A protein has these predicted regions:
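Phosphate/diphosphate ligand-binding glycine-rich loop within oxidoreductases
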Residues: 51-127, 141
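Glycine-rich NAD(P)-binding loop of Rossmann-like domains
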Residues: 126-152
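Phosphate-coordination loops involved in phosphoryl transfer and adenosine-cofactor binding
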Residues: 2, 72, 144-147
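N-terminal glycine-/charge-rich "phosphate-binding" loop or analogous flexible N-terminal tail
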Residues: 1-51
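Short gly/ser/thr-rich secondary-structure transition/capping motifs
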Residues: 34-39, 56-57, 128-136
């Protein structure tokens, strides 16, 4: 019998379908959130009742939702926080909970560098002016003239 997986996170597999291919290769039937927004409790209860696993976004997995999940063995939370999962209740029901604390690390670092460069070169201001039909040169500051520090 095929294992079933509910994916609440949105979007999932749209930019890169590698995770979906891996699930198919593992013969895991999956359901991707069809609502393009967080599930309500009622929607979660409907979808979670017959699944073995959940890849969860930030949807609230409450006691009521977990109680309706009769076959659930594992919740894998995308991202760094677990505050959307009632951990004590999950444990009492024998549901394992995992998460990806370092998952967004590289993306956050890359985005930070992007914002630094955009700020230094005033690209955002230039874009706004151009959208308003104004061609104005924003020179900004070059990296070679700067000392850049990142805290955090």
């Amino acid at each position: 019998m095929r294992k079933k997986l509910l994916i609440t996170s949105i979007p999932f597999g749209t930019e890169d379908n590698t995770p979906l291919k891996l699930l198919e290769e593992a013969n895991i039937e999956y359901i991707i959130n069809p609502f393009n927004q967080k599930f309500t409790d009622e929607q979660l209860i409907h979808y979670i009742k017959d699944v073995d696993y959940v890849i969860a976004g930030t949807d609230k997995l409450s006691i009521k939702v977990l109680d309706s999940a009769k076959k659930l063995k594992l919740i894998s939370r995308l991202g760094i926080g677990l505050d959307s999962v009632d951990l004590l209740h999950a444990k009492s029901k024998g549901i394992r909970v995992a998460y990806t604390p370092d998952g967004p690390t590289n993306s956050v670092a890359e985005y930070t560098l992007c914002l630094i460069l955009l700020s230094m070169r005033q690209s955002y201001r230039s874009n706004i002016a151009l959208r308003d039909g104004v061609w104005k040169k924003f020179i900004g500051t070059s990296i070679e003239e700067s000392k850049i520090g990142i805290f955090g």
